[in-house]
Amino acid sequence: MKVSLIQTNIFWADKKANLINIEKELETLTGKTDLVVLPEMFTTGFCIDQLELAEPMDGETVLTLIRWAKEYNLAITGSFIACENEKIYNRAFFVKPDGEIHTADKRHLFSMGGEDKFFSSGDKRLIINYNSFNICVLVCYDVRFPVWSRNM
């Protein structure tokens, strides 16, 4: 499986600019990769105190991710700021080329950065079988807790 990581300049709190920027990167990967890994909170940057940036699962970010996965025939993973049941989450996603999306919310919020003051933590792991690989999608600080990610 070919995996591509996109590390690019993020436009702070500017979803539209970030979506345009990421799509330009995706266009260069057409036919060259199976899975694209996007940065944490790729549409906004790490804007923990701007809760108005949070989106529901039927918002622009998710709809765009599904379109990209289908159009470019690849899987995409990363995270974005999600809102659900009046709570805000740093939500990991994995979108398959057919548009099927799976999500889980970041479990270990980074209190030293104040993330826990604005976000709610998740309680499940995201494990995807894709191209015969089992992939455990983790967001940033979650990788510091291998026992949780391995045993939960």
Mark where each language-model region is:
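Extreme N-terminal starter segment of soluble prokaryotic enzymes
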Residues: 1-5
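Short polar catalytic/cofactor-binding loops
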Residues: 7-12
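Cys-nucleophile CN-hydrolase/nitrilase-fold catalytic domain and related Cys-dependent amidase chemistry
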Residues: 15, 24-97, 102
